[in-house]
Amino acid sequence: MLSALARPASAVLRRSFSTSAQNNAKVAVLGASGGIGQPLSLLLKNSPLVSRLTLYDIAHTPGVAADLSHIETKATVKGYLGPEQLPDCLKGCDVVVIPAGVPRKPGMTRDDLFNTNATIVATLTSACAQHCPEAMICVIANPVNSTIPITAEVFKKHGVYNPNKIFGVTTLDIVRANTFVAELKGLDPARVNVPVIGGHAGKTIIPLISQCTPKVDFPQDQLTALTGRIQEAGTEVVKAKAGAGSATLSMAYAGARFVFSLVDAMNGKEGVVECSFVKSQETECTYFSTPLLLGKKGIEKNLGIGKVSSFEEKMISDAIPELKASIKKGEDFVKTLK
């Protein structure tokens, strides 16, 4: 049922170029000058769903904004530079996307980014809590398994926490799963949908191939290899880029897909489903990614895990200890802040 509800991967990006969509979303990108931020900002500028695009970073944002502002689409673009300009960037925003932070290099795990990115995310989300407390917050900055608990605890500190509006963007895992399944089966990836649950790092990434639409079957050895490739796809890109960065273009695509789905739902479109790492009661983990029915106020309904195979069931139980540790690490970090 979950997979049937979820739209094919590219449908939402295609819609973002249609002229009938409401053009009213005010979107901020924090970390807009970086490897993900620039192509993400380009995709957002290209969409009629967005009426105002505000870009923030600690360097180069005026140039990125000037460059994007010449594109012949409706969204107005303005760049903001440095902490003193951050409040103005956020005022009146409906959606804030946070790709800010340092990328992975070869040999690094997403968790190795924690010390740097935890501080960046805490600082940026604190500003969001003060200047756009009602906005949808979409966190791309890794490690997502920790940066979402950080975001939640920061919002709690400011007394404006709403669990239905804070999202860890795991969409790239779904995009990769769709692509890799389509490659193996000779299908159009735009017509494949694989729910991916759990978290957004290594073995916490749990593709539910048994729930794939259309239904696909793999022998166990191929299924194990496919699952491993989906889990380590980010590392595949880091290695291929040989020290020159991590997944930026595919992450920008996935981030834009999630934002467009969210804005569609905020505009009243029904049946919009995306997986995301959010506050959850679906497992013993306090945060967990599952398919979510999105609505005007964020999460309308958590659609849960659904029926899974014994292979997937084992992956879920194996992921929980690591997820719990990452969640605790994020929550404990906020306790150390002034």
Curated annotation (Swiss-Prot):
Activity regulation note: Enzyme activity is enhanced by acetylation.
Keywords: Acetylation, Glycoprotein, Mitochondrion, NAD, Oxidoreductase, Phosphoprotein, Transit peptide, Tricarboxylic acid cycle
Main location: mitochondrion
InterPro entries: L-lactate/malate_DH, Lactate/malate_DH_C, Lactate/malate_DH_N, Lactate_DH/Glyco_Ohase_4_C, Malate_DH_AS, Malate_DH_type1, NAD(P)-bd_dom_sf
Entry-linked CDD domains: MDH_glyoxysomal_mitochondrial
Modified residue annotations for N6-acetyllysine: K78, K91, K165, K185, K215, K239, K296, K301, K307, K314, K324, K328, K329, K335
Species assigned in the record: Pongo abelii
PTM sites of type N6-malonyllysine: K239, K307, K329
EC code: 1.1.1.37
Transit peptide: 1-24
NCBIfam families named among the record's database cross-references: MDH_euk_gproteo (TIGR01772)
Protein name: Malate dehydrogenase, mitochondrial
N6-succinyllysine: residues carrying this PTM: K78, K91, K185, K203, K215, K239, K269, K296, K301, K307, K314, K324, K328, K335
Residues listed as glycosylation sites in the UniProt record: S33
Quaternary structure annotation from Swiss-Prot or TrEMBL: Homodimer.
